[in-house]
Each structure stands twice: as structure tokens, then as C-alpha cells.
Amino acid sequence: TQIMSEGVEVTETQQTVDKKGVKDEMAHQLAKKLKQIAKDCNKAILTQSDKIAGDKTTPRQMGGIPYWITTNVLANGGSTRDFTTKLLGDAQEAAYAYSNGEADTVLLSPAQKRRVNAWTNGATKYMDEGATKLASKISVYESEFGIVKFVVERDLADSVVYLIDPSLWKSAYLRPFAKHPLPKIADKLQEVVVGEWTLEARAEYANAAIKDLKLATLS
């Protein structure tokens, strides 16, 4: 598991004054911190390649997608190459036997999405999504293994793309995120938002990672 927290501090004056559009300064600041925690959680899922048990001096750290996907890793020995339809097909084929074709979501950086737009000649379709995460638009592409959705993630490195089955991943909470009051210091009111959670990978072999990618110059 991993503990994440954000603290808030406001003065009694700030809390008492009814500012335009903000009747409760503490609640307003806590809402902003919750948004930041959501971003931090998403970044941890996408980028944390190590799982750390932790000790008195080192905090615990959960493993993210890079830590969990170990079976279907399409690397190139450190030599970079373009992200192509063939590489995507190879990743789909690698995961297909385990996922029954349910690995249908591609996570990639904004720059790699531009690469996708290039090899689809700008013909990428768009689907309406009832709920979006971090304002990422979702596009689709049909290959011989079926339709995949592309989800742009700003925290992903340009050198890696993930093909996942979202149903096989879950955020599990030992302690759900909640606010807790802290002792008052003089005129300052304090609260903290804290939670403890981890990422569960129910079948990492039904997903794939494409590594050692580069960005070719787009014309």
C-alpha cells in the first residue's frame, strides 16, 4: 500500500469572511487538494515501476502499471523505434491469448498520440465517453485483432505505450481518502486529507507494454 496526503491551512479570518463564490474557505481548499490527490494517484498508476516495502526512513510505495506488466513486454534492447501499427498488432497478439480480446485500451503520451494520428492519416474516429479522466479524449482504431481505444495520458513517458484490459485493474483502499482535523495553531485552522491504497493487477499477463519507442519527425 501507499499513503498519500495533502494538508490545508487557513486563517480564522479567511474562514469567517464570506468571499464572492466561496462561503467556506476550508472546504474550498480541501476540494482543491482532493483534485491534486486524484492527479497524484493517476501519476502513480502510470509511472511507478518499483514496489517499496518501506521502513523508518523510506515510505511505502505501491507498484504501478510499469511494475506489474512483466509477461508481454515488447522491448528492443534499448534501441528506439517508431510506434507502428505492426507493434500495436504484436502487442494485441501477445495479450490476446490471455485476455480473449478484452485488452482494448491503449495508454500513450500526447506525443505518441500524434504519431498515431500520422499513421491513421488523421482518420481516427472519436467516441463519446460519459466520464473522462483528466480531460483525456479517447479515439479508436480497428486492427486485425479488433477495435482499441487510445487514451492520452500526460504523465506517460514518450518511450512507452501500454495495452490494457481495464477490467483487470482495480484501485484498492485500505483506508479511503478522508479529511481529518489537526490541532489549531494560533489563528490557523488545519485539516489533512489522507488515504492508503494500492493498485491491484488481477491478470498482468492479459496486458502488454511496448517499450523503447522514439518520436520520428512528423511531416
Predicted regions span which residues?
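Flexible, glycine/threonine- and acidic-rich loop/arm segments that mediate assembly and lattice contacts
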Residues: T1-S219
